[in-house]
């Protein structure tokens, strides 16, 4: 996968998560907070990968890529929580 393809995929992931949070997560204070955490993490994946593409050194590249990977893992956690807590049916949070 090329850097441009990964850039497009991370952006699509962020947009898909925003739509999911708006349309499929039932609104109440707890769910809203979980949806906010998920949206923050997912959009940070896309923003973080763009930062990776602008890295000025190998060390900077590795550091920024690590941050983007952490945000991706956090996104997965929030999706798992939504699924396993019964807030959203499992079919909505599976790939």
Q: Can you describe what each PLM-predicted range is?
A:
Residues 1-95:
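Amphipathic alpha-helical assembly/interaction segments
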């Amino acid at each position: 996968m090329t850097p441009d393809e990964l850039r497009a995929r991370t952006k699509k992931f962020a947009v898909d998560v925003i739509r999911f949070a708006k349309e499929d997560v039932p609104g109440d204070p707890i769910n809203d907070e979980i949806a906010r955490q998920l949206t923050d993490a997912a959009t940070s994946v896309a923003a973080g990968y763009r930062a990776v593409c602008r890295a000025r050194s190998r060390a900077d590249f590795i550091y920024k890529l690590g941050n983007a990977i952490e945000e991706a893992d956090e996104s997965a956690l929030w999706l798992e929580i939504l699924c396993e807590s019964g807030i959203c049916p499992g079919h909505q949070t599976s790939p």
